[in-house]
Amino acid sequence: MVDPARARKLAKRIGTIVATAIDHEIKDPRLAFVTVTDTKVTADLHDATVYYTVMGADLESEPDLAAAAAGLEKAKGVLRSKVGAGTGVRFTPTLTFVADTVPDTARHMEELLARARAADDEVARVAAGASPAGDPDPYKEPRAEDADDAEVDEPSGSRQAD
């Protein structure tokens, strides 16, 4: 086991090395729109998981996840050698590439929030034209003290006998 801070620093360094290598050194067109989003390293520093996203060529096109995964698998050996040269650790971690689901989850959450905002706006629109049920002032009026109440409130020893 190793210090968690060291594992985090190594994970960050591996992510930087892999992202730089994908951008500048690997000439595979399938990796043109791949972005490294996160990297995790196991506690024994033997395995590294690299999370990535793939964007489409333009805003309307769907990303080709299968082609990007195949390109990363093909470049895995080159990327691992770059990581070994760039980190200087005794054992170069094996690289595993996983498509990151965070952007899809975030998009789904945004859709749910937009739907909730629309429902809130609808409720506010309906409530604007509504009138309250019952009396306008639903709270009870304070009771006025009657003469009968005043007699009850007097202490029992202070009453005069007839």
Swiss-Prot record:
Chain intervals for the UniProt region annotation (Disordered): 121-162
Alphabetized GO MF terms: ribosomal small subunit binding
This protein's record includes keyword Cytoplasm: yes
Keywords, sorted A to Z: Cytoplasm, Ribosome biogenesis
Pfam families (UniProt xref): RBFA
Biased segments, Low complexity type: 125-136
Compartments where located: Cytoplasm
Family: Belongs to the RbfA family.
Function: One of several proteins that assist in the late maturation steps of the functional core of the 30S ribosomal subunit. Associates with free 30S ribosomal subunits (but not with 30S subunits that are part of 70S ribosomes or polysomes). Required for efficient processing of 16S rRNA. May interact with the 5'-terminal helix region of 16S rRNA.
Descriptive protein name: Ribosome-binding factor A
Organism: Rhodococcus jostii (strain RHA1)
